[in-house]
């Protein structure tokens, strides 16, 4: 399941990051602290997703959310 399919307010564990070889996207997600085994929570869903990773919140687009498997 991808992060786009996640329920708002529920905590998930990242199982994988699948970027189809896009190293820039993978590096960006890692810089946010988003990697396999990390907890992530969807705070809001509108056009983009607001997610909480560790003690920070980030606004990510649907393409990034599709790369995050939970």
Predicted regions and their residues:
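Compact, glycine-rich, soluble single-domain proteins
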Residues: 1-70
